């Protein structure tokens, strides 16, 4: 065959949503229609008097739909195993992926948008938080709800309810410094929602898992969190 016409053939373009078609066809061909993503929970050592004398492992399988309810299921599984405390490590196995969390050609300034998460085999809520801001009494700070519940992120609420002089409502995070402080400012005149990514999805997953274990009365230290990575990861 011969080339009929060529226009900027060597220029790198972002494929946009048409890439979803190529991805879907490839996944169906390589993995098959019955493939299921798996996030597995296991431990080594022994459980004596409620204390796990060993390590607790969560192995990520790139599940894009692993949500807060799924994490709550993992927490229940730990409790049902009779574990009340962990003397070893809380291990996040992310060895299915290298350390490059964005694809080649992805724009760095698309963060903190939800469509550009920091990819990891361990993804909670697609690596994002859902934020809802509602007005309170006039002149008071707006009411901010963030899910999933976690202590991995912080909230800086500078919004003012029903006060136009406060300016346009802004919901963002300190992404330029890879921070995870959610900043809400401006006038809250009606209910507003936004979804933002968080920096370091694997850490978001494991920190939140530890937070939820502690909330259920299990003794687990965040200092015990450890990651198993691919051999070529940094």
Question: Across the structure, where does each feature detected by a protein language model lie?
Answer:
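Active/ligand-binding-proximal structured segments within catalytic/core domains
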Residues: 13-27
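A common structural microfeature
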Residues: 10-12, 18, 38, 55
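Short, small-residue-biased leader/transition segments that mark boundaries at the very start
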Residues: 3-4
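Conserved serine DD-peptidase/penicillin-binding transpeptidase domain
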Residues: 30-234
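A short glycine/serine-rich beta->alpha loop
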Residues: 8-13, 195
């Amino acid at each position: 065959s011969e080339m009929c016409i060529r226009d900027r053939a060597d220029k790198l373009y972002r494929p946009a949503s048409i890439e979803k078609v190529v991805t879907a066809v490839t996944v169906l061909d390589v993995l098959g229609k019955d493939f299921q993503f798996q996030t597995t929970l296991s431990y080594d050592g022994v459980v004596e008097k409620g204390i796990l004398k060993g390590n607790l492992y969560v192995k990520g399988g790139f599940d894009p739909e692993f949500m807060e309810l799924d994490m709550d299921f993992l927490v229940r599984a730990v409790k049902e195993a009779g574990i009340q405390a962990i003397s070893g490590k809380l291990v996040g196995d992310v060895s299915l992926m290298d350390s490059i969390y964005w694809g080649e050609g992805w724009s760095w300034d698309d963060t903190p948008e939800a469509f550009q998460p920091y990819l990891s085999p361990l993804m909670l809520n697609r690596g994002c938080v859902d934020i809802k801001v509602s007005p309170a009494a006039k002149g008071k700070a707006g009411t901010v709800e963030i899910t999933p519940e976690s202590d991995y992120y912080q909230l800086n609420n500078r919004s003012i309810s029903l006060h136009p002089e406060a300016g346009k409502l802004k919901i963002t995070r300190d992404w330029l410094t890879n921070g995870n402080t959610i900043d809400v400012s401006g006038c809250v005149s009606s209910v507003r929602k936004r979804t933002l990514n968080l920096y370091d999805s694997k850490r978001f997953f494991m920190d939140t898992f530890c937070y939820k274990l502690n909330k259920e009365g299990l003794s687990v230290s965040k200092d015990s969190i450890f990651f198993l990575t691919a051999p070529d990861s940094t």
